[in-house]
């Protein structure tokens, strides 16, 4: 049973990569995927022997294999042993991070390296069946570069909504708190006071952010802050949200219970 489950996920990943390739090639022929099983998330049922028709990079119809007619030139993909389901969504990711990024070793990881780590993780995420993700916090806008490369068809990966650097108070969860004073190290998203947080929101949007990420409390992996303590004031938070909404962006808040 375990082996069959793993095989299903590999097939799902393969189908995701196929769809990603189709998106980049709008002139591709019509694709008909014949699946042994299809998870219908609306009804909560698993349907058998279903055909998925893809035209111009979009799914245009789904129905029983016996009822879907094919034509000369169609690309037929036979997956009789596979279970196909809609692409999964992960609303909290950091694709530009890995084991090499955490703690003091992470201080040696450059922004270009962050982007390359992101390319590796983007492919793995797509192959795991996730076709849309929200990346909430990345140094140097490496997530923006990754999103743009995926959208341009240069590398495989899911659709990405990205925040750029997360906003933080000085010494907060998303500041750089590992180095001593003489290095004057500061996180990319640090901003204190109403005028400063408004500027940071606008700066993130200027450089390509789809949303704004805010570290509203301390965290368990940052040094010197309390995970239970509020960091931004209510007035600062209101200023962040108001400016982001005025500019057509949503705000994602990171907080501990």
Label for each model-derived stretch:
Residues 82-154, 170-173, 177-180, 235, ...:
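Metal-associated gating/positioning segment near the N- to mid-region
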Residues 159-162, 166-179, 206:
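Surface-exposed loop and adjacent secondary-structure segments within mature catalytic domains
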Residues 145, 196-257:
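Histidine/acidic residue-rich metal-binding segments in metalloenzymes
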Residues 38, 44-85:
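Histidine-rich, glycine-flanked metal-binding segment
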Residues 36, 52, 57, 81, ...:
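Divalent metal-coordination and catalytic microenvironments
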Residues 22-26:
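Boundary at the C-terminal end of the N-terminal hydrophobic targeting segment
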Residues 8-21:
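Bacterial N-terminal signal peptides
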Residues 1-7:
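N-terminal secretory signal peptides that target proteins for export/translocation
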